[in-house]
Amino acid sequence: MKRSKELITKNHSQEETSILRCWKCRKCIASSGCFMEYFENQVIKDKDDSVDAQNICHVWHMNIESLPEWISCLIQKAQWTVGKLNCPFCGARLGGFNFVSTPKCSCGQLAAVHLSKSRTDYQPTQAGRLMRPSVKYLSHPRVQSGCDKEVLLTGGGSKNRNHRLLNMARNNNDPGRLTEALCLEVRPTYFEMKNEKLLSKASEPKYQLFVPQLVTGRCTTRAFHRKSHSLDLNISEKLTLLPTLYEIRGKTTAYSRLNETQPIDLSGLPLQSSKNSCSFQNPSSFDPGMLLQRFSVAPHETQTQRGGEFQCGLEAASVYSDHTNTNNLTFLMDLPSAGRSMPEASDQEEHLSPLDFLHSANFSLGSINQRLNKRERSKLKNLRRKQRRRERWLQKQGKYSGVGFLDHMTLNNEMSTDEDNEYAEEKDSYICAVCLDVYFNPYMCYPCRHIFCEPCLRTLAKDNPSSTPCPLCRTIISRVFFQTELNNATKTFFTKEYLKIKQSFQKSNSAKWPLPSCRKAFHLFGGFHRHAAPVTRRQFPHGAHRMDYLHFEDDSRGWWFDMDMVIIYIYSVNWVIGFIVFCFLCYFFFPF
């Protein structure tokens, strides 16, 4: 009690922590710790109306040694030359950097890295007024603390700040609102408190601190919040609530999100509460692998039933700061046991780069801010397809081991699906373009060389067999040739379909119709026409043994000399009979 009184009476002044927000999306892009040392004097000059307009600085001068992570990435990408600074959330222009020829500002300072004041909003915020985001979208770290010995998540910080926070928490008697510092998406939440104070340790004012307002006595506080679609923690947006994206230099002990549809029982939590103190227990063991697994698995069951109100106990999650000697922004995760003291924890804490953390979770910065485009999705599909083919090949060879029962069933299903796809692709090469069915007695048409099945050709040549156009290119079909190899392949691969078409063709009248051919009458002595009988057409159904293609292909009358036709007709029976008749007539009219 004596120490508490000293804390209450000591230093009532509250130190301010300022942040910059994007003028377009209102997201936090930098804190006061990223500016030069003369930042406070610069703000005072800007507020003074009597200052000359020429001496007013219109940019925020950034400290190169403590730049935010997103600015450092842009500078390294530009290889420390010249570039623009765009908002990492909405892409709006915020400022720029120039290390080639460093310009000077109107205030006389170098503007190597600067943010424009007209494109950013300066917000001085009381350290005690900054609230943490919704408890539903943060992890649930538990810390062991007491009045005599403070064991906190933060790796460092001043004790005066802790005393000031305790003083503000005890003097806050009216029901407060659990507001947000980063406009996270939250829903109305009820929580009961039996505590009067919460011991926490904060860092320098340049880092963000989220402190829930405490209410003395037993009361129920309802928090109404605005909805923002920017930083919702779910799987589809790839863990956008990472502290590294908001310039929070600290270490966080994260836990999986609790189920939103079930009330939270405080009896299961190692929470110790009394009238004068509120302490949180730190688990004795923690697996960082389970952290990533819970981050990626837990929200699947809860994101479909969001928006409901539920009763919960006091959920505390704090984001703390840490002093780092490095220039780049680091993400510190503290994994000490409950029995370890603060110096031991600070000596053995793990330093993880934000990029290493994202790569370890199989995420990329591009996938956090936007979804995969079509090209990336097609690449992923191709990789999965190649992997499935390799697994099938190894399974056929008997070398694929280590596959469980479910994986085996999945592989079998994928194999059957791929086999069906391959079967469909093979069947496409044996389908007629007219009837859209497999070939039955296919014929190749000349001169266009398109292939169609016999029922389709006979149907097309029903009305005009001598000038039948090709159904694809509209070329007049002069002759057709039967394709034996294609017919045998169709009969072998698609036996059922082939037999079904054969039966329907034999039962239909199309079997009596002619095939298309430019069979013109051979004009003999200018008037006698030679026509082929339908019986002859049925005797040679496949056309490979007929000589129909040797007929004339024009409408000329009388004799049209062709040596091939002469030779053929000399050996024909008609000429033999004609020669005998000619000899008989000569003997009858011209006797010797």
Swiss-Prot record:
E.C. designation(s): 2.3.2.27
Molecular functions (GO terms): ubiquitin conjugating enzyme binding; ubiquitin protein ligase activity; zinc ion binding
Pathway where it operates: Protein modification; protein ubiquitination
One of the GO biological process terms: serotonin metabolic process
Membrane topology according to the record: Single-pass membrane protein
Superkingdom of the source species: Eukaryota
GO CC terms, sorted: endoplasmic reticulum membrane; nuclear envelope
Keyword set includes Endoplasmic reticulum: yes
Gene3D superfamilies per record: Zinc/RING finger domain, C3HC4 (zinc finger) (3.30.40.10)
Residue spans, topological domain Extracellular: 586-592
Phosphoserine found at: S230
Compartment(s) where it occurs, according to its Swiss-Prot or TrEMBL record: Endoplasmic reticulum membrane; Nucleus envelope
SUPFAM superfamilies membership: RING/U-box
Catalytic reactions on record: S-ubiquitinyl-[E2 ubiquitin-conjugating enzyme]-L-cysteine + [acceptor protein]-L-lysine = [E2 ubiquitin-conjugating enzyme]-L-cysteine + N(6)-ubiquitinyl-[acceptor protein]-L-lysine
The protein's assembly and partners: Interacts with ZIC2.
Domain notes from UniProt: The RING-type zinc finger domain mediates polyubiquitination of the interacting protein.
Function: E3 ubiquitin-protein ligase which promotes polyubiquitination and degradation by the proteasome pathway of ZIC2.
Descriptive protein name: E3 ubiquitin-protein ligase RNF180
Species this chain originates from: Pongo abelii (Sumatran orangutan)
